[in-house]
Amino acid sequence: MYKTQMEAAKKGILTKEMKSIAESESIDEKVLMERVASGEITIPANKKHSSLLAKGVGTGLSTKINVNLGISKDCPNVDKELEKVKVAIDMKVDAIMDLSSFGKTEEFRKKLITMSTAMVGTVPVYDAIGFYDKELKDIKAEEFLDVVRKHAEDGVDFVTIHAGLNREAVNLFKRNERITNIVSRGGSLMYAWMELNNAENPFYENFDKLLDICEEYDMTISLGDALRPGCLNDATDACQIKELITLGELTKRAWERNVQIIIEGPGHMAIDEIEANVKLEKKLCHNAPFYVLGPLVTDIAPGYDHITSAIGGAIAAAAGVDFLCYVTPAEHLRLPDLDDMKEGIIASRIAAHAADISKKVPKAIDWDNRMAKYRTDIDWEGMFTEAIDEEKARRYRKESTPENEDTCTMCGKMCSMRTMKKMMSGEDVNILK
């Protein structure tokens, strides 16, 4: 009847995933279906991911957030990463990407997919070296596609594919001076493979074969930005824009096959360039959902890049970005631990929510209004319940207990909420007693 969510939408078929998303997002079912059909909304939902609670990404929907997990050679503890998965899901993330970069990753990936109600993404090129136990240069073009198929068979909902880094883009990169060259891990690997083999990008050259795989499993392609800027100086340069144009062309080819697309974006970028970059992506990539890493608005804050990212993410999402990849305090320094992950998730969720208010996403402001009412009433239990990080709010209150229950240790009886509550109800205001 239909192979993909996009094909169903084009045929006027309301899938169970669409129905669920329309209800949870308070969006009209017909409007949602039209946007899935046009590609403005993507529903990453591999047919084999049975535990998935599908989410939509795109125009008119709440801003989604992704968490990156996975093992590395220096930190190969699978159990620690699986513990992160549990906590991330409890913290209401929308997507989890397995960015494992060491050894045989299949076991972790399969456990992740089984456990995760959130959509799961991967970067198959990371897996190729361990999968084949070969050096990068020795992997054949068709073998990269075979790894993509394996991930699809496992139930991965979306895959990052750096198909826009073709020979033209590589030649342009060589002619343009950058401070940080190529900072995308997958992009740098693909660049190295192309140079070492004097060959075209296998994903660009065999894009139709890639579409065959993704159509069969309804696996979304997240078109990676290999040439994204790795510092403020490199943002919005010719390399970045050239690749974005190519991603727009590949998007149209994918949509012709009813394969869903997400476009990945920067990166590192000054605040005053963010809105223009969002408009460029939406124009050049035909309003496909935009997924950004940050963007980080300054390069000088290692240890605090969850903050630099949240600033950029809020601005970007308010301007039209649909999907934020979280950044943790460990960015540029180490593999994040559990506490780093928690801080990154909270920072990203705050950015997404702030943007949703700006975008007038249905019911977004209601959360803030509930909190405001509880503050006016000095209802501590209500405030804790509505807090984005309830555990931290309760802990801070407990660690610094005031003399009077209707105050905190900042203002005491000079609390404005306490004063106005008493005045509005006709009570006396006593400060000294």
From Swiss-Prot:
Transmembrane segments: none annotated. Its EC number is 4.1.99.17. One of its GO terms (biological process) is thiamine biosynthetic process. GO terms for molecular function: 4 iron, 4 sulfur cluster binding; carbon-carbon lyase activity; zinc ion binding. NCBIfam families: PRK13352.1, thiC. Belongs to the ThiC family. GO terms for cellular component: cytosol. Keywords: 4Fe-4S, Iron, Iron-sulfur, Lyase, Metal-binding, S-adenosyl-L-methionine, Thiamine biosynthesis, Zinc. HAMAP family: ThiC. Gene3D superfamilies: 6.10.250.620, Radical SAM ThiC family, central domain. It catalyses: 5-amino-1-(5-phospho-beta-D-ribosyl)imidazole + S-adenosyl-L-methionine = 4-amino-2-methyl-5-(phosphooxymethyl)pyrimidine + CO + 5'-deoxyadenosine + formate + L-methionine + 3 H(+). Binds 1 [4Fe-4S] cluster per subunit. The cluster is coordinated with 3 cysteines and an exchangeable S-adenosyl-L-methionine. Substrate binds at N68, M97, Y126, H162, S184, R185, G186, D225, A226, L227, R228, E264, Y291. Catalyzes the synthesis of the hydroxymethylpyrimidine phosphate (HMP-P) moiety of thiamine from aminoimidazole ribotide (AIR) in a radical S-adenosyl-L-methionine (SAM)-dependent reaction. The gene is thiC. It comes from Fusobacterium nucleatum subsp. nucleatum (strain ATCC 25586 / DSM 15643 / BCRC 10681 / CIP 101130 / JCM 8532 / KCTC 2640 / LMG 13131 / VPI 4355). This is Phosphomethylpyrimidine synthase. It is an enzyme of class 4 (lyase).
